[in-house]
Design a protein with these regions (language model features):
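Structural motif
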Residues: 170, 232-233, 258
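ADP-ribose/adenylate-binding Rossmann-like module
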Residues: 197, 237-238, 249-274
Length: 325
């Protein structure tokens, strides 16, 4: 049985440390080159052990071939030379894979032993990049890198530089009701650092999780006013006065990536009028997205509402703040 593990922060070293268990070695597959159309981007990576996987390099025939080659490599060379077991696959997605993408990808396979992973584990809590040799040697930390390339994978002549974790955008979700619970379930494994806020601890689901930070706050607006300027905000509380206070805190400070409020067109008009009377200027009000979510879905079922909010979040991310109003 092939079990897939998901690490919410995309930190492959932490995932490897969890995945290795009692196994002697696992394979780390990295897409180091992409030409033409391909199912995943440069730097996409996955971990492969005998019975488990973490993440994906694109699924389908491509991933099946990578997994077969990786498991074959583990069995073939075992642990003869720790840290130096690696191979580059050159895969044409049309002829070789029978896929319609038609592009070409190169995948680096590196075999990591338990000791290799333990040595790397010290990096798992930091946003750093590692340099992965294409021919021999163990991954090494990139000590000097400019900010622009720090979180971007790139190919060098004899190695590939890969961040140990993705740079996550801060997302503040206000409200742990039906929609809030459904929304977090949908987006907890996306590229967001989730801060989930409510005034009552009982509203949160039971059990602990590493996929979000739970914040119990008597004054959520105070949390909003201290959020970083690159944060995304989704306001879906049970209370209109709470919604109003959070919106006012965010719009008056005017330092955020996106501010989305759940509600009808009537609520939107009412809130804009109230916020205007409270001193929020028209230019600031234009940055409030209400109703939040894509327009094509009109259902009021909590799960469907959560789906259309979740669908808008990556649009916000990828357009970097262009869609407002």
């Amino acid at each position: 049985m092939h079990k897939s593990l998901i690490n919410p922060n995309g930190n492959w070293i932490a995932a490897a440390n969890h995945l290795i268990g009692d196994e002697k070695a696992l394979a780390h597959a990295i897409i180091i080159s992409v030409r033409g159309s391909a199912p995943r981007e440069l730097g996409a990576n996955m971990l492969i052990s005998e019975n488990q996987i973490w993440n994906t390099v694109g699924g389908g025939s491509l991933e099946f071939e990578v997994m077969e080659q990786a498991r074959g490599l583990i069995k073939e060379i075992g642990l003869k030379v720790e840290g130096s077991n690696r191979k580059v696959l050159n895969l044409a997605l049309g002829p070789d894979m029978g896929q319609c993408c038609g592009g070409n990808v190169k995948v680096l396979l590196e075999i990591l032993s338990q000791s290799d992973i333990k040595k790397l584990a010290k990096h798992s809590q930091k946003l750093v990049a590692l340099e992965h040799p294409l021919k021999s040697g163990a991954p090494t930390e990139v000590l000097r890198t400019d900010d622009d390339k720090k979180f971007r994978p790139f190919l060098k002549k004899e190695s590939f530089v890969l961040p140990t974790a993705k740079k996550l955008d801060p997302l503040f979700i206000y409200g742990a009701g039906h929609v809030g619970r459904a929304l977090v379930k949908i987006i907890e494994h996306t590229d967001f650092d989730i801060h989930w806020i409510d005034i009552d601890e009982k509203r949160f689901p039971e059990g602990s999780t590493s996929t979000f930070s739970k914040v119990i706050a008597l004054d959520p607006a105070l949390i909003a006013s201290h959020a970083p300027s690159n944060a995304y905000h989704v306001i879906i509380t049970h209370s209109h006065p709470l919604d109003e206070a959070i919106c006012f805190a965010l719009l008056s400070k005017d330092q955020f990536r996106f501010c989305g409020l759940i509600g009808s067109k009537t609520k939107n008009s009412r809130f804009r009028s109230l916020l205007s009377k409270m001193g929020i200027k028209d230019e600031q009000l234009k940055k409030l997205t209400c109703p939040i979510g894509i327009d094509e879905i009109n259902s009021k079922q909590p799960v469907k509402v959560a789906i259309w909010i979740a669908a808008q979040l990556p649009i916000w991310q990828e357009t970097n703040g262009i869609r407002i109003g």
